[in-house]
């Protein structure tokens, strides 16, 4: 049951959307003056979607964020950078490991960004071949460095050290940033306490069952409302609302303000994930700001096969409990025990629904993979802490 992913402007909605033969549904991103303001999911009938049906669905599903964007647009107000201060210059960092084809697609997209003097840096993490290096050599504007120690957070820290500009915008190698992505991120750095700005992540495609399941069950989408997280947002266990590492930017001074990314967390280590959320929690605990701006849009290509999805969500399960282990034993956050218990309860409810074969259930193998990840998470974090002794990263 494939889903078409469409991108339409609110003021230019067509009377009918055609050419959707072979699709059962369409996920439609709605923009207003190029800014993402909402999304609608509609069934496809005979390869078409009625424009009238789309308009009705949009009005019915429009939330407060949509109408806020609409009013800002009508009044000609800007939601970010109200001071008019000049935006900083950025280094766009692509951290990758043995995925040269993804790197090529990502770099081709980055070449279409407006040239505002940004640097593009590929950090090749513990590569097994020189395939990625050879791909990068095809792009004269791209700089290539190797981080020999495995782990995404090692690669992120290497990017912070190597960057030549004040802000580092991280783009996943399987992502395709929108042309306005970088400018939208950078215009939010007008306040000195803003240490991190994250953007909206939408699915690039939903062509397979695995991709559709990921978007329905996990999703990187954090909504269409512009948000500022600061000292008033004190729950380090709810930082997932701040954004995702697939569409994240930070000041280079992060290293001196709050320290490097935790090398014991995320892809390439036994913990498999969690590095972004741990950093978000640390930034807020230190009294700095995180901004979520949905205008900073990036399209992400989800895993295409169920086997890949199962491995990914198993890793997310490990990473969740590894991060909560960090919060409990390193930060002294007793609330991590409550969060872990709630997560287990939710998965057990989903397991029960799967066993009863309820409609729209999560496949049994996915639920069991996540639960197994939960069980392994604390041990994975302990192993990772012993294996990866944090280096002294300096600017």
Language-model region placement:
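N-proximal low-complexity "stem/linker" segments adjacent to membrane-targeting elements
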Residues: 2-24, 28-33, 38-39, 44-109
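Short, acidic, metal-binding catalytic loop of nucleotide-sugar glycosyltransferases
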Residues: 108-117
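A conserved acidic beta->alpha catalytic loop
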Residues: 109, 124-133, 175
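Short aromatic/hydrophobic "clamp" motif used to bind/position activated sugar donors
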Residues: 168
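Conserved donor NDP-sugar-binding/catalytic core segment of glycosyltransferases
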Residues: 180-217
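Short, flexible, basic/aromatic active-site loop/helix in glycosyltransferases
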Residues: 199, 218-240
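A short, conserved alpha-helix in the catalytic core of glycosyltransferases
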Residues: 242-259, 264-296
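Non-catalytic, C-terminal membrane-associated alpha-helical segments of glycosyltransferases
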Residues: 314-318, 332-395
